[in-house]
Design a protein with these regions (language model features):
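Conserved beta-strand-loop-beta-strand hairpin that lines the nucleotide-binding pocket
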Residues: 1-6, 48-146
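Bergerat-fold GHKL ATPase/HATPase_c domain
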Residues: 1-42, 141-146
Length: 146
C-alpha cells in the first residue's frame, strides 16, 4: 500500500523553504521526534535545492508505504534537468564541483535510512529519501489521514 500525503511543485527559491517546512510538518504528523524531523527536513532541503539549481525545478511527493509496522516514509524529488554526469564520484564522496555540487547529495544520504538516486543524461534526476516510521508511531491509513 502506498498512501500519498502531499505533492508540491518546486519552481522558485521560496519553494525550497516551503518544502523544508512541509517536510518537518509531515514528519511530525507521522510521529518522528524533533531530531528526526530536522534530519528529514534537512535532507529534503538539500535535494530540493539541487533540483531547483541544477535541474530547473521539479516535483516533490510525500507518501507512506506499507500496511503494517514498520511503515516507510518515502519522499520522491524529481527534476527535469540534464542529469548528473558525475553521479558515481558524487555518491562515493570523491567529487565536488566549484559550486559545491555533490555535498548535499552525500549529506542527505547520511540523514536517511534509505537513499536511491536515478539520473540519466537529458532525462533528469529522481531521488528517493526513505525513513522507517518510529516503532511508537500509530499506523498510517487513508482513514487516519482523512
Amino acid at each position: 500500500m502506498s498512501l500519498s500525503i502531499l505533492t508540491t511543485q518546486l519552481s522558485f527559491e521560496h519553494d525550497v523553504v516551503l518544502v523544508r517546512q512541509r517536510a518537518r510538518q509531515v514528519a511530525k504528523l507521522l510521529g518522528f521526534d524533533a531530531q528526526d524531523q530536522t534530519r528529514i527536513a534537512t535532507a529534503v532541503s538539500e535535494i530540493a535545492r539541487n533540483a531547483l539549481n541544477y535541474g530547473g525545478g521539479g516535483k516533490i511527493e510525500f507518501e507512506v508505504n506499507g500496511k503494517t509496522a514498520p511503515q516507510l516514509m518515502v519522499i520522491r524529488i524529481s527534476d527535469r534537468g540534464r542529469g548528473i554526469p558525475n553521479l558515481l564520484e558524487i555518491m562515493e564522496g570523491r567529487y565536488q564541483s566549484r559550486t559545491g555540487m555533490g555535498l548535499g547529495i552525500v549529506g542527505a544520504r547520511r540523514l536517511m535510512d534509505q537513499f536511491q538516486i536515478e539520473s540519466a543524461p537529458g532525462a533528469g534526476t529522481t531521488v528517493l529519501l526513505k525513513k522507517l516510521l518510529p516503532a511508537t508511531a500509530d499506523l498510517v491509513s487513508q482513514q487516519r489521514m482523512n
